[in-house]
Design a protein with these regions (language model features):
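Short, charged recognition helix plus adjacent turn
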Residues: 1-11, 72-81
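Short amphipathic helical patch at the helix-1/turn junction of helix-turn-helix
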Residues: 11, 22, 50-51
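Short basic helix-loop element that most often maps to the first helix and adjoining turn
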Residues: 15-34
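Residues in the helix-turn-helix
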Residues: 30, 41, 70
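Recognition helix of helix-turn-helix/homeodomain-like DNA-binding domains
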Residues: 37-50
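Short, basic-rich loop-to-helix N-cap that marks the start of a DNA-contacting helix
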Residues: 49-59, 77-78
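DNA major-groove recognition helix of helix-turn-helix/homeodomain DNA-binding modules
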Residues: 55-70
């Protein structure tokens, strides 16, 4: 039997976006404008309902001046056959 790593489909990654945004003292609307996305996108990211595109993940990392891994929590689960 071989084990494989996978990400559950339909499950958004956990993240530290809300706390990072609040540390900067900005509103969702302000962050959305800076990143050129909607406020709803920021809200969905913060609430774990949406995974960002790779481009948006990089924009967030550059804005907060930290790595993508410091914003998003990537969890793998082992699948046993």
């Amino acid at each position: 039997m071989e084990s494989q790593l996978y990400i559950k489909r339909g499950k958004a990654m956990k993240n530290h976006l809300e706390e990072l945004r609040k540390q900067k003292g900005i509103k969702q609307e302000e962050l959305a404008a800076i990143l050129e996305v909607s406020r709803q996108t920021i809200g969905s990211l913060e609430n774990g309902r949406y995974n960002p595109s790779i481009l948006l993940a990089f924009k967030l990392a550059r804005y907060f001046e930290i790595s993508i891994e410091e914003i998003f929590i990537y969890e793998e689960e082992k699948e046993h056959e």
